[in-house]
Amino acid sequence: MALFSIQRSALLSLFAGLALTVWAAQWAAGVAESEARHEFQQAAAIRALQLKERLDAYEGVLRGLQGFFAGSEEVDRGEFHRYVVRLELKQDLPGVQVVGFARRVPLAEREAFITAVRSDRRLLAEGYPTFAIRPPGERPEYLVIDYTEPPQGNEAAFGLDLLSESERRSAAERARASGAAAATAPITLVQETGRQSSFLLLLPIYRNGASLLTDRKSTRLNSSHANI
């Protein structure tokens, strides 16, 4: 009887020890999982903050352009070029591939606009004799990329109608309706030769004197943009 009691006691101790070991292992795993989850959440929060700061910096570039246009009766191609060059974006914001200005062109003004761009010799002595709005065709209005910086490597974007493609048009319409910056979903830029994804950030530029509260949908709208 005593032997049975001793064996039973040893068995209970073994079971208790095993149960305690399993519980400790589960507790340790839970702690590790909790710590890993906490570290992941911290890393995600830091990454989100960094992304927001970077997006704020991108938007700041466009806000600066908005103010530059607001302070001038008309910003020509040479002035736009000199302004963007002074920003030194390649050094400070290397994620920005191109900064541009898209001009709203009603159908009735299309031919006059094309003629004006082709004969613009402020940057190139020969002007832009082959300039055309792309894709071709008659549409009620166009939002045409008129200025690009740097122009080298972004020739394919020059003349693109942002309203001709659904994702770009949606971002432009949201920007006009809100008066705030709007971004596209990831897209492949027309100047890309591969499948690299980027996104387009647009900020509206209204004609001088327009009421942003009452005339957003009816006023003449241009747009500054950055490809990122």
What are these regions (language model features)?
Residues 1, 225-228:
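Residue positions that mark polypeptide boundaries
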Residues 3-30:
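Extreme N-terminal signal-anchor transmembrane helix of membrane signaling/transducer proteins, especially
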Residues 14-24, 52-58, 154-158:
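Short low-complexity stretches enriched in small and charged residues
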Residues 27-60, 66, 70, 74, ...:
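Juxtamembrane membrane-water interface segments immediately C-terminal to a transmembrane helix
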Residues 37-45, 70-226:
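Intrinsically disordered, low-complexity polar/acidic regions
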